[in-house]
Amino acid sequence: MIKLNFTNFLEGNKSTEKIFKSYASKIETLNNSIEEKKCKGASMLGWMDYPSKYNKNEIKELINVSQEWYNNKKIKNVVVLGIGGSYIGVRAGIDWVLPEFNREKEIYYVSSMSSSYVYSLIEKLKKEDFYLIVISKSGTTLEIGVAFRLFYSLLFEKFGSEGAKERTVAITDKEKGTLRKIADTQDIQTFSIPDDVGGRFSAITPVGLFAMGVMGLDVNKVLKGCAKAIEDTKEPDIEKNTAYQYAALRHYMYSKKEKYNEVFCVYEDALRFFTEHLKQLFAESEGKEGKGLLPVNCLFTTDLHSVGQFLQEGNQIFFETCISIKNPLNDVVINEFLKDEDGLGFLNGKKLDYINKVAASSTIDAHHIDGKIDIIQINLDNRNEESFGYLYSWFSKVVAMSGLLLKVNPFDQPGVEAYKSRMFTKLKK
């Protein structure tokens, strides 16, 4: 499902073959530690098992409830309260599969404490009906706790206790935590977050699957793609495992070439939030003990008009990873409305996706040939539920190996607590 292209990386395939050989033994050893669940952070490898060993009854119930919400044409709005992996991965999946406009339902995400944004959304929803999805393992995440108070109380005011709970689903811990307690007290429908799956790996669990189902995605196809990726990446031989090939090249660029930034490039607006997911995935997994590549995401050609100058001729502390989709969800033919008055007559009758792909290949040529930038290309055929699930789990295996190559625990994020503890101390004064 995934094809890697190394044509524009170092000197091409000859270079990558040498690198793969140098990493082969180390990769095999680390792969065994992952598969045998003996690696650093092994207690948080549940995302590897989930696509094939999930609770069948819970997912059946999740699909039934999400389809019921999706089929209710009277309620057009869905509000998702989540932050980090409880937001980014959810949105990445929905945006990956659905067209940007004319969706069956409008979805709004509350993932910050911007008073202006929250006020505007509340004012809109005072006049309209909406469903509410709250996602938090503990229920003590401040951003989500505050948002839940505001939006659940709005439902309560509009529809009463019964109406509010009918329009709400909580995704939280199976047994414990503040949100679990509130959901049980209020008799709110819940689905559980597995104990052994961290936030940035969790979009393939009810964390992401419920909202995806509400928006019309086929949950089973997402899980099918995930399961295939996990199976494909069990292979210990780096020559046969694209996830480990990519992990090895990332580590090589960091440790041997002193490239400390990775720029993720996409040419489709719908893929932007997948690169936001990658930003969190790699930053939280690798950024420890003074180590790690800083992930940066770019939407081309838009960002070529802002950071393009730096990428072409600036401080070359980075390499690029470009993700592309062969077949667009939809396409547009350039009309002959102005004939050649604008000097663009040579584009008459051409498809917009073709023009976009020419821009992509031209940028790759300019960056690699002229700018001497090393570029890894990740190519997929289609945007759909299965390809999203596959790529999501494929990158999860990449980051597991990447973190272990750096000799850090890829599955914790202790540094995130620093701002939280200071924030709570100040707020309680």
UniProtKB/Swiss-Prot annotation:
InterPro entries: G6P_Isomerase, Phosphoglucose_isomerase_CS, SIS_dom_sf, SIS_PGI_1, SIS_PGI_2. Pathway: Carbohydrate biosynthesis; gluconeogenesis; Carbohydrate degradation; glycolysis; D-glyceraldehyde 3-phosphate and glycerone phosphate from D-glucose: step 2/4. The keyword NAD does not apply. One of its GO terms (biological process) is glucose 6-phosphate metabolic process. It comes from Malacoplasma penetrans (strain HF-2) (Mycoplasma penetrans). It catalyses: alpha-D-glucose 6-phosphate = beta-D-fructose 6-phosphate. Its EC number is 5.3.1.9. The active site is at residues 284, 305, 420. PANTHER family: GLUCOSE-6-PHOSPHATE ISOMERASE. GO terms for cellular component: cytosol. Catalyzes the reversible isomerization of glucose-6-phosphate to fructose-6-phosphate. It comes from the Bacteria. Keywords: Cytoplasm, Gluconeogenesis, Glycolysis, Isomerase. Its main location: cytoplasm. Belongs to the GPI family. It holds the Pfam family PGI. HAMAP family: G6P_isomerase. The keyword Methyltransferase does not apply. GO terms for molecular function: carbohydrate derivative binding; glucose-6-phosphate isomerase activity; monosaccharide binding. It is an enzyme of class 5 (isomerase). It is found in: Cytoplasm. This is Glucose-6-phosphate isomerase.
